């Protein structure tokens, strides 16, 4: 919802997004979690930290629902405590190598 129009989103402000999220949560908490992960974690992370190429490549598809974002936090020996996690991302040349394991990936089954 908060993805700017230049990337295919509606450009909703934070208050409007939270009000919409609250209304969704009244009806279905699970759907609100998916909405929150998709918008607050995935889209917002790309907006704040992504390259211009990544923003152009992913945000319009995320904003229209063509693809769904996912979030992997929980690890077998750390639970959801980020201070105990051991998964690492190491930059190698022009890409990242990921090593580790996750127990749950929120919306992982439907992620694009």
Residue spans of the language-model regions?
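Short, conserved beta-strand segments within well-ordered enzyme catalytic domains
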Residues: 1-2, 19, 34, 70-72
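Structured helix-beta-strand junction loops
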Residues: 27-30, 64-65
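Catalytic-loop motifs flanking and including active-site residues across diverse enzymes
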Residues: 13-16, 38-42, 112
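Glycine-rich, Trp-frequent "lid" loop and neighboring beta-strands that shape
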Residues: 7-10, 53-112
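Active-site PLP-lysine loop of aminotransferase-like
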Residues: 29-35, 102
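Glycine-/proline-rich flexible loop or hinge segments
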Residues: 1-8, 25, 39-43
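N-terminal glycine-rich flavin-associated loop
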Residues: 33-53, 79-82
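Glycine-rich loop at the start of a catalytic domain that most often binds anionic cofactors/ligands
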Residues: 8-25, 47-50, 86
């Amino acid at each position: 919802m908060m993805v700017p129009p230049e990337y295919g989103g509606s450009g909703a402000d934070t208050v409007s997004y939270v009000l919409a999220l609250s209304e969704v949560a009244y009806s279905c908490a699970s759907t609100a979690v998916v909405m929150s992960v998709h918008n607050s974690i995935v889209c917002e992370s790309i907006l704040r930290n992504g390259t211009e190429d990544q923003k152009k490549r992913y945000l319009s598809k995320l904003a229209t629902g063509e693809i769904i974002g996912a979030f992997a936090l929980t690890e077998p020996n750390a639970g959801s405590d980020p201070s105990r996690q051991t998964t690492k991302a190491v930059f190698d040349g022009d890409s990242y190598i990921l090593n580790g394991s996750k127990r749950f990936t929120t919306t992982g089954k439907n992620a694009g």
